[in-house]
């Protein structure tokens, strides 16, 4: 059953997303500029653990010498080094379509994604679009991939060790072990887009 939780602050939301993902939940969040920056430590963990997730970002200017609520990509680019894949939308229709593509691709690739769009114009725009139907969404999500995600969840029935402190040799080996997932991702995203074109 889908649920929605609201955190008292952005930092708590980041930790809640990470925790929910560790339990095998299909979890997403919606963020903009300053809130995204508060999530960066958790984003490194999520990407490092190869956990499927999608963060929908209304991209806005970061506050520097002054606050600005208008759109640019400075917030998204600040989070670029976290290991998240990045998909951009240029219209309301694309925002809907890319959102579904991102959710399907993250399950296949095990790479989390930032799906971002203009945080002032696109996020406030009202427009007629071709709305995705529940059957279309269902067809895009592979049940086997959802099951695999849930089997990687933390459970007393399947104990695993996570969040350890490691010496440089072991840490380096573990970091290199995730490279095949990143190397496969550029092929998975176009395949997911092709599937979307066939389904919708």
For each feature predicted by the language model, list its residue ranges.
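Thiamine diphosphate
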Residues: 1-78, 84-107
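Flexible glycine/proline-enriched surface loops and loop-helix/loop-strand junctions
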Residues: 82-83, 177
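Conformationally flexible catalytic loops at phosphate/diphosphate-handling active centers
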Residues: 113-200
């Amino acid at each position: 059953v889908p649920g929605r939780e609201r955190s008292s602050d952005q930092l708590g939301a980041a930790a809640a997303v990470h925790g929910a993902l560790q339990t095998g939940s299909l979890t997403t969040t919606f963020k903009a500029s300053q809130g995204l920056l508060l999530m960066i430590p958790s984003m490194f963990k999520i990407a490092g653990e190869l956990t499927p997730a999608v963060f929908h970002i209304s991209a806005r200017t970061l506050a520097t010498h002054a606050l600005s609520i208008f759109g640019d990509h400075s917030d998204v680019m600040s989070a670029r080094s976290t290991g998240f894949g990045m998909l951009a939308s240029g219209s309301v229709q694309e925002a809907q379509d890319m959102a579904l593509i991102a959710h399907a691709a993250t399950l296949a690739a095990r790479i989390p994604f930032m799906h971002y769009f203009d945080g002032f114009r696109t996020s406030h725009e009202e427009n007629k679009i071709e709305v995705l139907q529940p059957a279309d969404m269902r067809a895009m999500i592979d049940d086997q991939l959802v099951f695999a995600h849930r089997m990687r969840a933390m459970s007393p029935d399947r104990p695993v060790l996570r969040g350890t402190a490691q010496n440089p040799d072991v840490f380096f080996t573990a970091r290199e072990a995730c490279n095949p997932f990143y190397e496969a991702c550029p092929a998975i995203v176009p395949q997911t887009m092709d599937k979307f074109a066939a389904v919708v």
